[in-house]
Amino acid sequence: MEIKVPQLSLVLLVGVSGSGKSTFAKKHFKKHEVVSSDICRGIVSNDENDQSATNDAFDVLKYIISKRLKNGLLTVVDATNVKAESRKALIRLAREFHTLPVAIVLDLPQRVCEDRNEERADRNFGRHVIRNQKLQLKRSIKGLKREGFRKMYILKSEEEVNNLTEIVREKLYNDKRELHGPFDIIGDIHGCYDETILLLKKLGYVISTVDNDGKNYGLAVHHPENRQVIFVGDLVDRGPNSPAVLKLAMSMVKSGSALCVPGNHDLKLQKKLNGKKVQLNHGLAETMEQLARGSAEFITDVKEFLYGLISHYILDDGKLAVAHAGIKEEMQGRGSG
């Protein structure tokens, strides 16, 4: 069994005292990735069990988390986190730094947690504490997705915890640091298909007509020197042939000869195709008329293509960021929490 978390994420360990959160964190994460509420309590009071120091401890905990997320570092919160109210402040931090929140819940049987606490001389504070925490967890656990967690994992037994072999760190969709180009970055085509074909040929791309397999739209585009196009949005509107531009971009993205990020015109078209109320101005009316001449199947393909576009890409070992109309540095390479 494995758990997958985004490479840049805020991971909340959730569980009552004695559920094994600290042991879990030590086993699966690096030492400095884990921010412990107990350690923070000790820092501000010299006693990890001093409950009167909890408010100060969580001020320190949130400060450390904010600095780590600001610096683009995966961070794990080792605290009970059994109350939705407690998790809310941490989710707010994740959103502030455009980081995806993940919950790993250790929902072990109450008796197991009680027995473990009785074996710890510094934590034997009575079974009623575990019972209350367990009730709080039970009340709130079903609402984790609604709270804003992007991924949730619930481990309900010691066996499940012990059978966890690996926590896999997944790259964000916008992370293409391994691609080094050369790149040809093309923006604001606005339905001008013929001009785009001329430009691609001038840049050395070979454009061939092939059998239409339903995804290549009868086009095959490649560069003999393995250059790659990055379309920087605004594929549609204003020009005479937005559907052909879409087919070109969709075919090239499918084959790997191009990447594409959306522009505001593309996002507006997506809203319209999904039935949202938008103003048919700035060329959108013409695009809708052009699309209406084609098949319903193609319109479905366009909807799926636009839905799958990523806001920006980070390329070339982090030296290049590509987005329509720019992106603030602190948002580069981030996800939306």
Feature locations, PLM:
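Conserved GTP-binding G-domain of TRAFAC-class P-loop NTPases and closely related GTPase folds
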Residues: 2-14, 19, 31, 96, ...
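Conserved substrate/cofactor phosphate-moiety recognition/catalytic segment
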Residues: 19-75, 85, 111-114
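Active-site glycine-centered loops adjacent to acidic/histidine catalytic or metal-binding residues
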Residues: 38, 188, 234, 263-264
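ATP-dependent NMP and nucleoside kinases share a basic, alpha-helical "lid"
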Residues: 43, 47, 69, 82-122
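Acidic, metal-coordinating catalytic cores used for nucleic-acid/nucleotide bond scission
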Residues: 78-87, 235, 239
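Active-site neighborhood of divalent metal-dependent phosphoester bond hydrolases
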Residues: 129, 224-226, 238-322, 329, ...
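N-terminal active-site segment of His-dependent metallophosphoesterases
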Residues: 162-246
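Short hydrophobic beta-strand that contains or immediately precedes a catalytic carboxylate
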Residues: 185-187, 231, 260-262, 322-323
